[in-house]
């Protein structure tokens, strides 16, 4: 079975699906709210290169967060893109970076406009959610679709909502009024204003998801979700060429099948799984914060530690209190520029006298055989 191939007969082709793989991708598209969904069998690194190569041409400018995955860099080298890096806000106390503020994106766009290069900007590339749990408005966020709170910050939900909003008369009036206000605006005014998109704007959103990391799938199982109004007319051919370039003619059918199994599982049980995951993370926070010895040396970082106050319009600094339990996360996720995924637990170990790497290697791994994914 490990050597199954479309040439053997009776099996569908990942490169030109027309049978069960085509149906599985259509079901995944329905589940995740995309217009089209494509499966990949060698990870989201490949998905990233496919999307960049499909959309970007030599000389195009791409805005990308400086802390992005290395596959984006390789994709942009292959596409011949000119890169403008976006800086995240720093968390100096913890030797970490946060997220890219909207002001930083607008600052770079205004600089490109002044240089006469704004028309060459082709793509904005951001990582949502980050390893540390910072959420923007998807590689490690596939489960978010199946929680009402999380869903509103997913790429596909946002794209669908934005497309509906752009068609309303209220939006057109608001845009017209703001444009009149901005006629004599300075660059600083543009940076401070919450800009309203023109009604004629085209919604073009792509999300690559590491299904194998945040849902049930074999290693390297990933998906590309597309919500692009111009996909059929402008991108479809180049997308399929990029997909053919980076996809093996002998894909692992077990990985493909596991992607379909993972989709079916979360459609049936996803809400319960996500709720239990959040509850387990909150229980862990309570255990650390209430233990007399642990709380002396360890601190679980909350939203107030990782997101500056001016990006938390709700004013909430923690989603969980040892005495009172949960706060109303939904309000935070509706209002704040950035939110913190409560299932990502970031533990500050500075109180032990060790830095993160030393604590990970010399204590947890060498003494207790506990492996930690990421430290700073």
Mark where each language-model region is.
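Residues within well-ordered alpha-helices
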Residues: 25, 72, 137, 359-361
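Conserved C-terminal alpha-helix-loop-beta "cap" of PLP-dependent enzymes
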Residues: 278-376
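Conserved PLP-enzyme active-site core in the AAT-like
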Residues: 42, 46-57, 63-293
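Conserved N-terminal alpha-helix of the aminotransferase class I/II PLP-enzyme fold
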Residues: 2-46, 194
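Short glycine-rich or small-residue beta-strand-to-loop segments that form or flank ligand, phosphate
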Residues: 11, 38-40, 124-127, 346
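General small-molecule cofactor/ligand-binding pocket signal
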Residues: 38, 84-86, 373
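Short active-site oxyanion
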Residues: 35-37, 59-62
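Glycine- and acidic
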Residues: 9-11, 33-35, 240-245, 266-271, ...
């Amino acid at each position: 079975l490990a050597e199954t191939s479309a040439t053997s007969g009776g099996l569908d082709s990942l490169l030109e699906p027309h049978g069960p793989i085509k149906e599985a991708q259509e079901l995944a598209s329905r589940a995740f709210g995309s217009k089209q969904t494509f499966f990949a069998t060698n990870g989201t690194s490949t998905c990233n290169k496919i999307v960049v190569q499909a959309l970007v041409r030599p000389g195009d400018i791409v805005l990308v967060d400086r802390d992005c995955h290395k596959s984006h860099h390789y994709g942009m080298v292959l596409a011949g893109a000119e890169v403008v890096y976006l800086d995240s806000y720093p968390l100096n106390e913890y030797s970490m970076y946060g997220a890219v503020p909207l002001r930083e994106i607008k600052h770079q766009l205004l600089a490109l406009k002044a240089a006469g290069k704004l028309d060459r900007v082709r793509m904005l590339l951001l990582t949502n959610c980050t390893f540390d749990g910072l959420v923007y408005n998807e590689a490690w966020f596939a489960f978010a679709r199946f929680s009402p709170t999380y869903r509103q910050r997913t790429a596909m939900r946002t794209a669908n909502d934005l497309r509906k909003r752009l068609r309303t008369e209220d939006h057109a009036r608001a845009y017209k009024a703001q444009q009149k206000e901005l006629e004599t605006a300075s660059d600083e005014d543009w940076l401070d204003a919450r800009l309203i998109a023109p009604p004629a704007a085209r919604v073009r959103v792509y999300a690559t998801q590491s299904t194998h990391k945040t849902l049930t799938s074999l290693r390297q199982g990933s998906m590309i979700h597309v919500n692009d109004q111009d996909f059929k007319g402008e991108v479809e051919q180049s997308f399929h060429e990029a997909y053919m370039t980076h996809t093996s003619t002998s894909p692992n059918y077990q990985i493909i099948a596991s992607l379909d199994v993972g989709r079916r599982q979360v459609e049936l049980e996803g809400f319960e799984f996500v709720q239990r995951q959040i509850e387990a993370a909150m229980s862990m926070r309570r255990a650390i914060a209430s233990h007399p010895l642990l709380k002396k040396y360890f601190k679980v970082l909350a939203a107030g530690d990782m997101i500056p106050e001016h990006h938390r319009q709700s004013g909430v600094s923690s989603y969980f209190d040892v005495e009172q339990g949960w706060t109303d996360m939904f309000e935070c996720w509706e209002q704040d520029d950035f939110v913190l995924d409560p299932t990502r637990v970031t533990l500050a170990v500075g109180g032990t006298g060790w830095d993160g790497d030393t604590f990970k290697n010399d204590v947890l791994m060498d003494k207790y055989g506990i492996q930690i994914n990421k430290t700073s």
